[in-house]
From Swiss-Prot:
It catalyses: [protein]-peptidylproline (omega=180) = [protein]-peptidylproline (omega=0). Gene3D superfamilies: 3.10.50.40, Trigger factor ribosome-binding domain, Trigger factor, C-terminal domain. Its EC number is 5.2.1.8. The gene is tig. It is found in: Cytoplasm. Keywords: Cell cycle, Cell division, Chaperone, Cytoplasm, Isomerase, Rotamase. One of its GO terms (molecular function) is peptidyl-prolyl cis-trans isomerase activity. This is Trigger factor. Residues 162-247 form the PPIase FKBP-type domain. Belongs to the FKBP-type PPIase family. Tig subfamily. PROSITE patterns: FKBP_PPIASE. GO terms for cellular component: cytoplasm.
Length: 442
């Protein structure tokens, strides 16, 4: 294959390439097969015209357009690979020559990825993370579990925040009832914020048997627009008041909330370990985010083509809607439920698209600089993990995603890990002082 690449701009160029006679012949044969069943030639039954007769009657040139559409995608992809360029978006391709019994020559106007000049990406300074677990953290988790295991017991006297009341209520606006404004024997935890602001507060201090006229104003941004901003009266009857009875903090409690322990001390140790793991994960995520941000900031990229921005927005949109569909919500239903449109969703994803593209370009450049590779074992594991995550057959995943695509994701993660592992944690005060010095020097 004859291929010539000539840059015409920082992210544009012209790719001239040939399509061989053998490829063209295959394309012509396929094009003829597609139209044969509907062909009409005088003296022949419909669909029973040979290729020789077709060429005599219509001329081989009548198949050129269809044949080109058949062979062009593979020919263009091969030319891009041969030229060693990273093409993005859709090229504009025009024929230079399409002579009979000769190779065809095409010229494509192509957008390519911008060049990345890496700066420092090892030893990036990031804010020091504190992963220490304090006694107050353990106590807070124990309190949370006691709350979750609490029993509700009838209470005499006035209701307080944290108590649960059983109520009947009937709401009216301007003396008229409205949909969803009434209920009977409803259990409501005071202070939970379940009801609109002000409702729960007006029940505090009342007892079982009390009738309370609750007066509230629906928020201006309330979901039901016919109620938003309006004052409502709720005739409310309190039937019961219950308070939480927390379990004793002892070995029995420990065994009840976690069957893998036998004592309270064991529960505390397990909580400490779990909290430590959580803090270390949060810390690692923070270090990674800051380190990658630093590596991207240190890199130089000329300009990001619009085609890459649009590809990123398309990817984000398809992934988001795909997640919705896996939850049983099709795009049109989602737009209706959220009162949004596809254009609005695209605009939302477009806000950070340039930064996402720049980050990916820097990570890919690090993959190349460090010569990071994905092994067959890593690709096989990736397929297993994806199949388990999306509840799919491994063969389906393997047929859907190429080894190149999977390998790309694996090596990019390796680049992220490399940046993270080589990051240096320093005191936040030192970083702030350095940032201040950098700003003053500019």
């Amino acid at each position: 294959m004859s291929v010539k690449w000539e840059k015409t701009g920082k992210t544009t160029g012209e790719l001239t390439f040939d399509i061989s006679k053998d490829e063209i012949k295959l394309g012509l044969d396929q094009a003829f097969k597609r139209i044969k069943k509907n062909l009409r030639v005088p003296g022949f039954r419909k669909g029973h015209v040979s290729r020789v007769i077709f060429d005599q009657y219509y001329g081989e040139e009548a198949l050129y357009e269809d044949a080109l559409n058949i062979v062009l995608p593979n020919a263009y992809a091969a030319a891009v690979k041969e030229a060693g360029i990273n093409a993005v978006g859709q090229p504009q391709i025009v024929p230079v020559s399409m002579d009979k019994d000769k190779d065809w020559t095409m010229k494509a106007t192509v957008t390519v990825q911008p060049e990345v000049e890496l700066g420092e990406y090892k030893g990036i300074e990031v804010p020091k993370q504190n992963t220490r677990v304090y006694q107050k953290d353990i106590d807070a988790e124990l309190d949370k579990r006691r709350e979750q295991s609490a029993e509700l017991v009838l209470k005499k006297g006035k209701a307080e925040n944290g108590d649960t009341v059983t109520i009947d209520y009937k709401g009216t606006i301007d003396g008229k009832e409205f949909d969803g404004g009434s209920a009977e024997n409803y259990s409501l935890e005071l202070g939970s914020g379940t009801f609109i602001p002000g409702f729960e507060d007006q029940l505090v201090g009342h007892e079982a048997g009390d009738d309370v006229d609750v007066v509230v104003t629906f928020p201006k941004d309330y979901g039901a627009k016919d109620l938003a901003g309006k004052e409502a009266h709720f005739a409310t009857k309190i039937h019961e008041v219950k308070s939480k009875q927390l379990p004793e903090l002892d070995d029995e409690f420990a065994k009840d909330v976690d069957d893998s322990v036998d004592t309270l001390d064991e529960l505390k140790e397990k909580i400490k370990k779990d909290l430590k793991d959580q803090k270390e994960q949060v810390a690692n995520d923070a270090i990674q985010e800051a380190a990658i941000e630093g590596a991207v900031k240190n890199a130089t990229i000329d300009e990001i083509p619009d085609a890459m921005i649009q590809e990123d927005v398309d990817t984000q949109l398809n992934q988001y809607l795909g997640n919705m569909q896996r939850q049983g919500i099709d795009p049109q239903t989602y737009y209706k439920l959220t009162n949004t449109t596809e254009d609005q969703l695209r605009s939302q994803f477009a806000k950070n698209a340039a930064e996402r593209v720049k980050t990916n370009l820097v990570l890919e450049a690090i993959v190349a600089a460090e010569d990071l590779k994905a092994t067959k074992e890593e690709i096989d594991k990736e397929i297993k993990d994806l199949a388990a995550e999306y509840n799919m057959d491994e063969k389906v995943v393997r047929n859907t995603l190429s080894d190149d695509m999977l390998g790309h994701d694996i090596t990019v993660r390796k680049a992220m890990d490399l940046i993270t592992d080589n990051a240096k944690q320093v005191a936040k005060s030192k970083l702030e002082a350095k940032d201040s010095d950098d700003k003053e020097s500019k």
